[in-house]
Curated annotation (Swiss-Prot):
One of its GO terms (biological process) is translation. One of the primary rRNA binding proteins, this protein initially binds near the 5'-end of the 23S rRNA. It is important during the early stages of 50S assembly. It makes multiple contacts with different domains of the 23S rRNA in the assembled 50S subunit and ribosome. Residues 54-106 are annotated as: Disordered. Pfam families: Ribosomal_L4. Belongs to the universal ribosomal protein uL4 family. The keyword Kinase does not apply. It comes from Bifidobacterium animalis subsp. lactis (strain AD011). GO terms for molecular function: rRNA binding; structural constituent of ribosome. This is Large ribosomal subunit protein uL4. The gene is rplD. Gene3D superfamilies: 3.40.1370.10. PANTHER family: 50S RIBOSOMAL PROTEIN L4 (PTHR10746), LARGE RIBOSOMAL SUBUNIT PROTEIN UL4M (PTHR10746:SF6). Keywords: Ribonucleoprotein, Ribosomal protein, RNA-binding, rRNA-binding.
């Protein structure tokens, strides 16, 4: 399989060569990506559902206080019959069929999540929206990080993928409003498709490819 060529820029936004990325991660065609949009959708829906706390709750008529006796006699008052002042139709009454705490998480096979990520990355790569930036930061500097990213992504929302060793890069990009930093071992489909650009640091790309290649061989 032929590899995918990704452009590399330096910390000044100037071209600094290219890097080869595995076709199995970045090289699916637009037709193949389109055919797997339902897969991407299913994985993203499951991920967003798993992020929900599910702690919503209301009190039903058995949980609210009061209402131990019948408010008035059954007949002879001219009013509608009532059995409790805590019935749902009463002010301060219990809620009927209200939400209860629940777990929204869905079971998604690992192979589905891995495949969805590959198709999402391929979609961005097919549209020229995957890049590699060699930040080369000796100390944290948001100004330098902006200078490195601006020529590549302008003001578009960008997911920046870093290795665990890219401490200076992480501290530099985390305060940029249009940038969402994430470590290579945490990259997921949702953070790819919600970004207009996906930018890898050189170490971040190496870490990502190494992890996915090792997982496939295992």
């Amino acid at each position: 399989m032929a590899n995918v060529t990704l452009n590399v820029t330096d910390n000044n936004g100037k071209e600094a060569g290219t890097l080869e990325a595995p076709e199995a991660l970045f090289g699916f065609t637009a037709e193949e990506v389109q055919a797997h949009v339902p897969l991407i959708h299913q994985v993203v829906v499951a991920q967003r559902a798993a992020a929900r706390q599910g702690t919503h709750a209301v009190k039903n008529r058995g949980a609210v206080s009061g209402g131990g006796r019948k408010p008035w006699k059954q007949k002879g008052t001219g009013r509608a019959r009532q059995g409790s002042i805590r019935a749902p139709q009463w002010y301060h009454g219990g809620v009927a069929h209200g939400p209860v705490p629940r777990d929204y998480s869905q079971r998604t096979p690992k192979k589905m999540k891995a495949a969805a990520l590959r198709y999402a990355l391929s979609d961005r790569a097919n549209n020229g929206r995957v890049a590699v930036v060699d930040f080369q930061l000796d100390a944290p500097s948001t100004k330098k990080a902006i200078a490195a990213l601006a020529p590549v992504v302008a003001d578009n929302f960008t997911t920046v993928v870093l290795s665990r060793d890219n401490v200076n890069e992480w501290l530099s990009v985390r305060n940029i409003p249009t940038v969402y930093p994430i470590f290579a071992d945490q990259l997921n489909t949702y953070d790819v498709i919600t970004a207009q650009y996906v930018v890898f640091s050189k170490d971040g790309l190496e870490a990502f490819v190494a992890a996915k290649t090792a997982a496939k061989e295992a």
